[in-house]
Amino acid sequence: MYAIQNCKRIEMKICIFGGTFDPPHIGHLLVAQTVCEEEKFDKILFMPANKPPHKKNISRVEDRLAMLNFAIEGNPNFEISDMEIKRGGISYTIDTLKDIKSSFIKEEDELSYLIGSDSLLELSQWKEPEEILNNCNVVVAIRPGFRPSDIPAWILHRIRFANIPRFEISSSNIRIRWRENKTIRYMVTLPVWEYINQNKLYA
């Protein structure tokens, strides 16, 4: 399940969807499916981070992988890669892109990287941001309140915005609602909800 061997073929359009997925929610799935259809990607590759450079106190890798597996189950266009987890340490996007391009895809394949507009605001602070733009097409899912004028011109001219619906769901809000004993049903898939409940995550 956690592999990308099926992505090996000429002129395949692959889109990496990186994140902590703590937990993966309906917004993640709707964005991924819509982008897949709108951009005509052959595969959306979910890439859970081992240790994000800007986040702390995240759930165990095993829990996040299990929830993500439940979330995408049954969708032939979705796959999971544990590349960043196996690499260990802090997960940097540029390292992942270089690893994928050198080991898993052909020169003729097209590689894209999907991020939210909230992450786009921080892209200039990521490790080797110019190299990220050189190694893939950055596709941005716009979140409410986003203003293109907040993005440096050298980045803005080298990305493209996806034509997708905007959702007000976030993993952090889900964790807060759970701790406050508020429902998160319909914000995550039922198997993910059951996993969170059974394993007492976010308590």
Where are these regions (language model features)?
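Nucleotidyltransferase catalytic core that binds NTPs
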Residues: 2-203
